[in-house]
Amino acid sequence: MDEIIVNSGAKSSLSVALQTILNPGDEVIIPKPYWVSYTEMVKLAGGVPVVVDTDPENAFKMTAEQMKAAITDKTKAMMLNTPVNPTGVLYSREELQALADVAVAADILVIADEIYEEFVYDGNKMVSIASLGEAIKNNTILVNGFSKTYAMTGWRLGYAAAPADIIAGMKRIQGHTISHPSTITQYAGITALEEKGEVVNEIIRIFDERRRGMMARLDKISQLSYIYPQSTFYI
């Protein structure tokens, strides 16, 4: 339990993590496009967001070379969301390994937002960057929650996994802010985990059906193009 914290949603995990690790002026690399709150959370924690433009030819995924180019002596962390909101793309094991190598070499923390981990289609596999070896695991703050997988957005339940010293800092900050998720929410989360199986499979099936239907309609509009969504529920 020294490496786990439970809180009021993945958003809370991200915010508390940034408040824990950042000193004023520290930089955080954020690939673009990104979830709207990333940059604002960094600013609220006293940090400086460094937004990296990505290329549609690479499905808007940041490369190791782009990450290297964004690193300065003030870089503290990189925020990595895969599966990606808002593009629906998925980083491969090879792409993640390349980013992990850069992070470890530069001793940069990776804040891995994996909230859409179950929403992966067409036989693709979601790989967690923290699973790629002990070195990158020790440099990763993994964030997840119940809002997407279990359709529990309003319940506000999330968690983070990280080295014990980071989690200890997060617990101190959380103790003076939200304290903890409500007891009712925690019991609901236990039930969700225990009954995951077919319920989650059905949720994924429904979203996959919607995804295919949307793509079929978009394919009929010659003036529009899109990046093929391997994951999430965005195009």
Tell me what each language-model feature is.
Residues L132-G169:
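Active-site PLP attachment segment
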Residues I190, I206-M215, Y226-I235:
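Conserved glycine-rich beta-strand-loop-beta hairpin in the small C-terminal domain of fold type I
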Residues L44-V50:
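A short helix-loop-beta submotif of the ANL/AMP-binding
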Residues P181-I203, F233:
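Structural motif of enzymes handling amino- and sulfur-group chemistry
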Residues T20-V42:
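Conserved PLP-anchoring active-site segment centered on the Schiff-base-forming lysine
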Residues M1-E27:
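Phosphate-binding glycine-rich loop
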Residues D55-N124:
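Active-site phosphate-binding strand-loop segment of PLP-dependent enzymes
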Residues A45, A105-A106, I136:
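Helix C-cap/helix->beta junction micro-motif
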